C-alpha cells in the first residue's frame, strides 16, 4: 500500500525538532509568568531563535554630495498619511489587543532650528558641497577632486582666464543662488544647485590656485541641530533601529504579548544605506514613562540593536564642535 502524503522518514527531522505539547504548555506558562514579572520573555525568545536579528547601521559613502548629509531637517516632517512630528503608536486596548493611535512628540518640533538669510554672501572657496550633478553617482569625498576626475579640461591651464570662462556658464544661475548650512556636517556649506556643478567646482579649484576672490551672493538656509532638544528627547524615549520587515510581525507580536506600548517611525534620510530589503531599518520608540519599556530597551541593547539615541548624541556633539 502506498504511504499517505506527509508520512515517513522525510517528516522525521521535523517531528524530532518540534517541541512536544507538554513542552509548549510549560513554556507558555513560563512566558506568562515572566511577562507578569516585568520581563519580555517572548521578545527574548524571538531574538534567541534568530527570528529578530540586529542589523548594523550602514552610513552611505562619505561624499561632498548632499546625498551624504543626514537630513535631520526633514526628518518627521510629515507625509501624505502622517502629521509632522507624530508617531504611529501602539498600546494595549480591549481584550489585550493593541490599538493604533497617532501621538505627537513635542521634542521633535524643537530638534532643528531653521533660519533663512536672504542677503547671504560668501567666497566661492567657502562652498564645500553640492546638491546635484550628472556625476552625482561618483563617490568623491573632496570638492577639489571633482573637476580633477570629471572635468579636467575645465581646469587646465590654471589661469584667471580659465577661471573667468567657467564663471560664465549659464547653469550657475547667478541670480538664483541658494545655499544650505548643516550644523552637524563637517563640510557645512552646500550649494543647492540644479545645474553648473562641473563649472562652479572648476572655478573654485582655479580660485584656490590663482588666489582670486570670487564672491557669491544668494539665499542661505541654515539648519542647526539643538543639543538641548536632543537631550530632552533622550530623557523621554528609548529609540532603537529594528529591521523594518519585522516591526509589525515578530516584534509586534512580542510587544503585544508583553503588553508593552511602542511607537514606530522612519529613519532620517541618508542615515542608513540598506544593501537589501532585509537590511532596511525603521525606528521603534519606547516611552520611558511606561514601566515595562526599560526591560525591553535593556534587552535590545544587549542583543546589539543600534541605539538611535547614540546616533543623536554623536550628531549633536558635531554641532557643538563646528
Language-model segments: residues:
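Secondary-structure boundary elements
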Residues: 169-173, 208-213
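Alpha-helix boundary/N-cap detector
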Residues: 20, 24, 34, 60-63, ...
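C-terminal interaction module
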Residues: 241-322
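Non-catalytic protein-protein interaction scaffold segments in large eukaryotic complex-forming proteins
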Residues: 2-39
Amino acid at each position: 500500500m502506498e504511504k499517505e502524503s506527509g508520512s515517513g522518514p522525510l517528516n522525521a527531522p521535523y517531528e524530532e525538532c518540534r517541541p512536544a505539547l507538554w513542552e509548549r504548555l510549560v513554556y507558555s506558562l513560563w512566558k506568562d509568568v515572566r511577562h507578569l514579572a516585568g520581563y519580555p520573555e517572548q521578545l527574548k525568545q524571538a531574538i534567541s531563535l534568530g527570528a529578530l536579528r540586529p542589523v548594523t547601521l550602514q552610513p552611505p559613502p562619505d561624499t561632498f554630495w548632499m546625498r551624504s548629509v543626514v537630513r535631520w531637517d526633514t526628518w518627521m516632517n510629515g507625509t501624505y498619511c502622517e502629521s509632522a512630528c507624530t508617531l504611529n503608536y501602539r498600546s494595549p486596548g480591549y481584550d489585550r489587543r493593541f490599538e493604533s493611535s497617532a501621538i505627537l512628540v513635542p521634542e521633535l518640533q524643537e530638534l532643528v532650528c531653521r533660519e533663512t538669510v536672504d542677503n547671504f554672501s560668501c567666497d566661492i572657496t567657502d562652498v564645500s558641497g553640492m546638491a546635484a550633478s550628472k556625476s552625482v553617482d561618483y563617490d568623491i569625498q573632496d570638492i577639489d577632486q571633482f573637476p580633477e576626475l570629471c572635468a579636467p579640461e575645465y581646469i587646465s591651464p590654471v589661469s584667471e582666464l580659465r577661471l573667468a570662462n567657467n564663471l560664465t556658464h549659464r547653469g550657475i544661475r547667478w541670480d538664483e543662488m541658494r545655499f544650505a548650512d548643516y550644523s552637524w556636517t563637517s563640510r557645512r556649506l552646500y550649494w543647492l544647485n540644479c545645474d553648473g556643478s562641473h563649472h562652479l567646482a572648476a572655478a573654485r579649484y582655479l580660485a584656490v590656485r590663482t588666489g582670486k576672490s570670487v564672491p557669491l551672493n544668494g539665499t542661505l538656509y541654515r539648519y542647526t541641530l539643538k543639543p538641548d532638544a536632543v537631550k530632552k528627547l533622550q530623557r523621554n524615549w528609548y529609540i532603537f533601529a529594528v529591521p523594518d520587515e519585522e516591526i509589525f510581525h515578530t516584534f509586534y507580536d512580542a510587544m503585544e504579548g508583553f503588553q508593552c506600548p511602542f511607537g514606530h517611525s522612519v529613519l532620517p534620510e541618508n542615515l542608513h544605506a540598506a544593501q537589501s530589503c532585509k537590511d532596511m531599518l525603521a525606528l521603534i520608540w519606547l516611552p520611558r514613562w511606561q514601566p515595562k519599556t526599560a526591560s525591553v530597551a535593556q534587552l535590545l541593547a544587549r542583543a546589539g540593536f543600534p541605539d538611535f539615541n547614540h546616533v543623536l548624541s554623536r550628531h549633536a556633539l558635531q554641532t557643538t564642535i563646528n
